């Protein structure tokens, strides 16, 4: 395979990945916002299953199949990107029906088996909704259960991977400053650290003054303990030269972010404030720029009008006197008669070239409007942050492990498998964030007195908020991991 064909295939994969990311970011929130919880869960588990099956077939074909099977599975894998919109429309149209809602609420014929229900409903108009119900019951509900119980995994793994990324940034900055002997990197790292610490202190101040999250005595005490430990670890890393200024500032900023994540409403408000600030700055600078028409208006007002003027210049304005045979032949084949014949084609071409982009523009505007009303900036920012941390971990962990060639190849195969199944991980992560910020996750978590068998009789139940509890666990686990790395590492 030539380098040109490899570059072409790589470009195609990148375009398909961007197309998939865009459609995933837009379609999943729309399914939850428009269709409801059941529609969103059904749509996401269908996407997850499709990507899991096609990825597995692709991996098996690459390992055991020939070129024909590899080509077929590749086509199957990349073609599913184009059916996301059709799947979204299918589930939106299905769950918008009132009959299906009644079926889901009343648990339609729960005593019957799946085959019996299908057999009894063959002559009924509700066969599609029966299929929807059982699909929801046997596929979607386990998916919802897994997402509900996966909060500790996503939260704690994010903290661990973030520590790896922070230390990788610190090592890179240390190499740029010492090995290259460049004062520019030292000054830039100090300026960056100062900006990060200033922004973190500002948003830490907002936590104490905002009425969105009322602080109790226990919460304020925990915050004071956490901030004291973080500042102490940061100063210890700088003084002992086991860390750096950029590491300490990023670590402090991440802990402040985790504190915001304890309250989803607080995190959403902070994200909206940041985006509104960027929006105000952009609008202020945009007023100073000369406004111009958009591309479609330019296409209609300039290009089409110039084409009409050019076309009209070919048409003779007056009739000339024709005396000889040559002039008669020219008059027969004149531009006037040619224009009469080709005028309908020109009108069709003109209307087609304007109406089709206009319809596409209207469709895109409707989609963007639905997406803007459905997509939460806090969810997208959290998703991008988690994807970045998880991707960084897949690069950092193999680099930290000193292995022989055989173990290194095995580690690379594992990381390659993670890359192959990354769409499934992304769908699960995105759906979990949407459920978290919409309040659909199980909020109550019993940590004491839940079972008489384990805790004994007459033990008081201690029930806490699930999301807040696991975020506090993430904060303390992250501090513990970073402290272990600082104390256990050499200077």
From Swiss-Prot:
* Chain coiled-coil ranges: none
* Localization per Swiss-Prot or TrEMBL: Endoplasmic reticulum membrane
Q: Name one GO molecular function term.
A: protein serine/threonine phosphatase inhibitor activity
Provide the Gene Ontology terms for cellular component. cortical endoplasmic reticulum; endoplasmic reticulum; endoplasmic reticulum membrane; perinuclear endoplasmic reticulum
**Where's it mainly located?**
endoplasmic reticulum
Per the record, membrane topology reads: Multi-pass membrane protein
Please name the GO terms of the biological process aspect recorded for this protein, alphabetically. Answer: endoplasmic reticulum inheritance; endoplasmic reticulum membrane biogenesis; intracellular zinc ion homeostasis; post-translational protein targeting to membrane, translocation; protein localization to nuclear inner membrane; septin ring assembly
The record places the following residue ranges in the Cytoplasmic compartment, namely 1-13, 62-74, 171-184, 240-294, 395-413, 483-491
Task: Read off the InterPro entries from this record.
Answer: Ice2
| Transmembrane domains' residue ranges | 14-34, 41-61, 75-95, 150-170, 185-205, 219-239, 295-315, 374-394, 414-434, 462-482
Question: Which regions of this chain are Lumenal-facing, per the record's topological domains?
Answer: 35-40, 96-149, 206-218, 316-373, 435-461
Q: What UniProt keywords apply to this chain's record, in alphabetical order? A: Endoplasmic reticulum, Membrane, Transmembrane, Transmembrane helix
- Any remaining note in the record? Present with 606 molecules/cell in log phase SD medium.
Please state what the protein is called.
Answer: Protein ICE2
At the highest ranks, the source species' classification is: Eukaryota, Fungi, Dikarya, Ascomycota, Saccharomycotina
Name of the gene this protein is made from: ICE2
